[in-house]
Each structure stands twice: as C-alpha cells, then as structure tokens.
Amino acid sequence: LYRYKIGDVLRVANFYNKAPQFHIVGRKNVCLSIDVDKTEETELQKAIAASELAHLRPHNARVLDYSCYTDVKTIPGHYVIYCELSPINHSENSSFSRVIDQCCLTIEQSLNSVYRTLNAYYKTIGPLEIKLVKDGAFHEVMDHATARSASAAHFILEILEARVVSTHFSPGVPSW
C-alpha cells in the first residue's frame, strides 16, 4: 500500500481473503493551472480515458500510468503528460506516432471550456504535450521513493524525463 497517499480517492476493486484491494480513482483537490484555467484530476483522468478508448484501444494499447505538470518555462505555458503505455512495439511506427498526436488533441477536446478557449482563441495556453516513457518508468519512480523514504514528488520529473522515448504535441487546437 505504499503507493497510496493521503488525499487519494480509492475504490475497492476486489478482495483477497477478507482484505480489500484498491484501485486509485483520483486525487482529491489536485489541479493544473496555467492562466485562469483550472483542470482537476478527475477531469484529466476522464480526458485520458476518452483518448485511450478512441485511439489506443484499436491498437491494443492502453495507458498503464501517467503523471502531468504545467510547463511554464515555455511561452505560452502548456500541459505535459508523461505516459507509460502497455508494452507494444510503437517506438519506430510513424503511424502510431500520429495516433499519439491525436490522443493529445482528444485530451484537449475533453477538457473544460476555459482551457479550450485559452488554448484556441487567446493562445495563452500552448498545445498539450505527451511524453511517452519507457516500460517500467513509474515502477522505478516508486522504487526510488521507497528506497529513500521520500515522496515521489521531489524527483518524479527528473526520473521520468530521463526515460522519455518520444514526445508528441497536439496537431491542432480544440474547438471552443
């Protein structure tokens, strides 16, 4: 249970003997913001699920884990999602690269109207970016955290960035 933190919203998925087994549903009161937008964890989770269903499942791929942050070092700032997919041979497939680009756009289309307006009309939010990480990257983050008895938040970006295998941006702007 070392993966669960205070503020995680859990759902009992199964029982092993009489002990409950949990799945993380989301995190309470976690949000991303660049301008006046506010994207909560549950909204982002639904957007990623919609993108997975529309684009990844037809290729027998699925999202195993993800983490996101707002990159405000670029102008305009934008959302970055580190994503680990189920093990498939996608690294050299250019058509799969276009699939991930479409995932970016579908996620943006699924976010709230404030985000879409700031992205499409005002241009104060840049295109969403997905960075695919190598298989097992999120397990490495958790192993690193437990070995140091520290929160993964302190070093997650550094570890994930070192394990990026490809980078993808939204090919268009969401409708608003």
Language-model regions, residue ranges each:
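AMP-binding adenylation
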Residues: 1-176
